[in-house]
Each structure stands twice: as C-alpha cells, then as structure tokens.
C-alpha cells in the first residue's frame, strides 16, 4: 500500500496518522512516549519498509505533535484512541515507548475490543516517587512557554524528550514537536498530557492477557531492567542505549519486534 498521512477524528479528537506497508499481512501499531511525536519512529520506519510483512500505523497521540489537544489524557483515553485506529485488524502487533508502551500494555487487557498478538515495550516506568509525581503536577499546571524563534522551540523539544545528544534541532523530528501561533513558537505537546504519570503500571500489567515484552536501555534513567524484572523476570536490557532506545538503535528495537512477532530476518 502507498504510504499516506491522514487526519482521523476519534472520540471528537483529530489525530494525525501515518500508514504504510503492505495490504496483506499483520498490522503493527507504533506508539510514541510523552511529549514525543510519531516521527520519533523514523529510524524504525525505514526498517519496516523493507522487513515488515504487513501494514504499519504510526499516530501522533492526542495532545501531541500534529494531533489536536483534548480535555482528557488518561491512559484509558489513549488506549481507546489506539483501539479505534486498529478497528478491523486481527491480532495486531503493538509496540510502544514509555507512555506508548503502557498504552500497549493496557490494550493487552482485551477490554478495548482488540486482541493483540503481542506487545513490545521499551522504557515503561514502573513506579513513581512522591517527588516525581510532584514534578509532574507542576508540569501539568505550568503555563505555556512561548519562544521567539522556531529554533529555540526545537531546542526545547529535543531537551524535554531526552533527545538532546541524539537528535538535531534542525531535524524533521524536532519540526513535528513544535507549533507556531502569531509569530511565536511553543512545544506541540499539551503539558496536561503528563497526567498519564498517575496510571498504575503494576495494576495495568497484571491485567494484560496478551504476551508483553518489557525492555529498557542499560542507560535508561527513567526505569531500570531490574525494576522491570519485578513485573517479568524475562525483561530485557538493551546495551549501549538510554531511555530512547528506539531512536538510538532502531535495529535493536526492530529485533525485539521481529522476535516477538515471529518475523524471520
């Protein structure tokens, strides 16, 4: 199928959605993390063009990137959005980073009308401290910060997403993370989307009824492999990468997908 971009209205929210791949075969949904955009999967997307045997879907989730803002950002709202994108897909494969990974695990419960074949995650935070929750509460209530130039906003985007040493502000990815209004620029993400930090990862994981792969970069400062292993002793460490493993080493993330989905190289 031809690679295409569309705006899908789901639950009254306009979501930016990119699709590509092949008409026949399994469906793969890739979900970004907090403050990110679908373009963060650019490196993985290049591999999919050659190796994924079916269709792939990469959205900007509500309140992020080129999608519209919302009044609600609970993890269940994101899961319902993603389930709607997967309408008609049989046993889709789900892959997500951080927040997107947790959305995938919630979809593995079967409560949203889909039955994933497997869910592959990297960097899903397990436990939040009181101090971390206080920091998120401050972020949620913070007024919008406007910048005088596009480049200043892009620099802020790569900083808050933890990509400063990996992605250039001049990149296509950074462009998708900022918006302009009346000659000023801001981050595209709605700060209220940080409410996902109040989701209980352990409860959500316990409700999963489909196989879930848990992984984290060995340099991930958000979550350690040891913390993930309190959920699943088989949780994997990814060598040489940090929280944004899918950006730092797209091939390593693809190998997680291929292994879990039974795709032979």
Language model segments and positions:
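Catalytic histidine-centered segment of alpha/beta-hydrolase-like enzymes
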Residues: 241-254
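Active-site loop/oxyanion-hole signature of alpha/beta-hydrolase fold enzymes
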Residues: 13, 18, 42-45, 51-95, ...
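Alpha/beta-hydrolase fold catalytic core
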Residues: 1-29, 46, 50-54, 90, ...
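Flexible "cap/lid" loop of the alpha/beta hydrolase fold
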Residues: 106-109, 114-149
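The serine-hydrolase catalytic nucleophile loop
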Residues: 34-46
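Gly/Ala-rich beta-loop-alpha elbow adjacent to hydrolase catalytic centers
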Residues: 96, 100, 104
